[in-house]
């Protein structure tokens, strides 16, 4: 039996495990409120005058931050796997994240001089949350026995989902207002008086996400055990990068089936993330949705994703992981094409429908209802694809390579995360079309699916 390292973290008590899982709850508003449903659509459709140009800038900022994260991940991963405490690194990257989120406040409508500040702030927040997550993930194996790692990981995933839904419901229900009515999603006056003419509610989403993070990450810092002691930083970097190169060579030479799956997953995960990041932006551009509609849209989509994840677990045991991924991908791609087929006065690219009439109420037009339907399809598919991807890897990798290959699994989710956003930014800038720009994500999804087909489901 291998002996424990002298500076290894002690197994966590219940409050330590809950504290670790709350990291996902703490970070989720960044993804839900800022990246997907509220601030990003405001940046494109409210902060700047030209939505296509704004989308390309937002995509470039996303891609640049993800590229930086991908470049730093191997080095930081080596540090995280060495005998160094993780919490100081998480604290440092948390400061980056919170400062970046607070910088989004400067996105006053029409303030073109603030565009570089806002984009830099968003990139800083993105880099901070991605790198803090590297160290938080590295804490997990030392907190609980190996046979219960899946349970802990699943708990954190569920807690993160709940955090996104709760933060979205609170902000949309009590703070962010419809510019036309001055009311929140619940029909209430905002809990804090804010200037609608300068879109203070939308701009406050960043600082609120930062404050949410500071409050709910505290249990992790206070109660979750960490490694103690220290070794020099240089040694684990050299050793970790050397091991990474050796492991990559072994993967490509002796485990090509696993390598093919990781390549497929890298592409379809990148495309799927891009659809989520830019789908809300596109919907808001087409129908002129404000914070109220976007909040409701986000809640509906998140609930759909939750139910999809629940169903996917049952299907995985019934028809197998690969079949679930393929089936989920077909639904996801159909939903993404459907979303892009919707315009203000047409659906399915050429079927005419009556345009939106503001006085008829929220989501009253046929185009909006079609957009919701296709978005729910995406939500239903994304959970099963994510969960079954992890399960498939566990089933096809050799038992003695599980930890190593799951490291590649995590790494593959980051290494090309910049590609789809940068491609979307470039195509949007070249064509001036938001629809054509976002359609690039379909290429990643389809190629990833095609590469998955020959993957064997046995070791």
Where would I find each of the regions flagged by the language model?
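Juxtamembrane intracellular "pre-TM" segments in multi-pass secondary transporters
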Residues: 2-18, 225-263, 356-362
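Short amphipathic helix-loop junctions that connect adjacent transmembrane helices
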Residues: 32-55, 277-297
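Central cavity-lining transmembrane alpha-helices of secondary-active solute carriers
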Residues: 58-78, 168, 299-311
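Cytoplasmic membrane-interface "Motif A"-like loop-to-helix N-cap segments
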Residues: 80-96, 317-332
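C-terminal ends and interior cores of transmembrane alpha-helices
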Residues: 91-112, 330-364
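Multi-pass alpha-helical transporter architecture, strongest
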Residues: 105-106, 212-223, 342, 438-459
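Loop-to-transmembrane helix entry/capping segments in MFS-fold secondary transporters
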Residues: 52-56, 146-156, 291-292, 399-409
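Helix-to-loop junctions at the C-terminal end of transmembrane segments
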Residues: 71-85, 307-321, 342, 347, ...
């Amino acid at each position: 039996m291998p002996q424990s390292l002298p500076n290894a973290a002690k197994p966590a008590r219940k409050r330590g495990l809950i504290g670790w899982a709350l990291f996902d709850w703490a970070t989720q508003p960044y993804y839900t409120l800022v990246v997907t449903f509220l601030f990003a659509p405001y940046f494109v459709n409210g902060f700047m005058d030209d939505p296509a140009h704004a989308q390309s800038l937002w995509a470039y900022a996303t891609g640049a931050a993800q590229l930086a994260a991908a470049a730093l991940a191997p080095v930081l991963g080596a540090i995280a796997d060495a005998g160094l405490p993780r919490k100081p690194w998480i604290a440092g990257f948390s400061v980056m994240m919170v400062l970046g989120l607070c910088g989004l406040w400067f996105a006053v409508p029409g303030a073109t001089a603030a565009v570089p500040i806002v984009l830099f702030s968003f990139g800083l927040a993105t880099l901070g949350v991605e790198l803090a997550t590297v160290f938080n993930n590295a804490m997990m194996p030392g907190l609980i026995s190996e046979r219960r790692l899946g349970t802990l990981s699943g708990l954190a995933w569920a807690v993160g989902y709940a955090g996104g839904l709760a933060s979205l419901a609170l902000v949309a229900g009590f703070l962010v207002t419809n510019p036309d009515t001055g009311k929140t999603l619940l029909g209430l006056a905002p809990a804090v008086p804010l200037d609608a003419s300068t879109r203070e509610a939308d701009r406050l989403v960043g600082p609120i996400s930062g404050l949410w993070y500071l409050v709910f990450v505290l249990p992790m810092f206070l109660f979750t055990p960490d490694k103690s002691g220290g070794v020099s930083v240089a040694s684990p970097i050299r050793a970790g990068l050397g091991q990474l190169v050796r492991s990559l060579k072994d993967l490509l030479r002796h485990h090509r089936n696993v390598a093919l799956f990781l390549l497929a997953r890298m592409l379809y995960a990148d495309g799927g993330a891009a659809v989520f990041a830019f789908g809300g932006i596109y919907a808001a551009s087409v129908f002129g949705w404000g914070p109220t509609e976007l909040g409701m849209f986000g809640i509906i989509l998140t609930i759909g994703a939750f139910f999809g994840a629940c169903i996917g677990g049952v299907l995985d045991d019934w028809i197998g992981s690969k079949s679930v991924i393929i089936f989920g991908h077909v639904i996801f791609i159909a939903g993404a094409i459907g979303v892009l087929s919707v315009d203000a006065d047409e659906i399915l690219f050429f079927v005419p429908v009556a345009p939106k009439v503001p006085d008829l109420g929220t989501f009253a037009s046929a185009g909006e209802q079609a957009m919701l339907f296709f978005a729910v399809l995406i939500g239903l598919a994304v959970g099963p694809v994510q969960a079954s991807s992890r399960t498939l890897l566990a089933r096809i990798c050799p038992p003695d390579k599980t930890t190593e290959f799951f490291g590649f699994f995590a790494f593959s989710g980051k290494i090309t995360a910049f590609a789809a956003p940068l491609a979307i930014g470039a195509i949007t800038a070249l064509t001036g079309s938001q629809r054509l720009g976002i359609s690039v994500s379909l290429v990643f999804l389809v190629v990833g699916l095609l590469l998955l087909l020959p993957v064997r489901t046995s070791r």
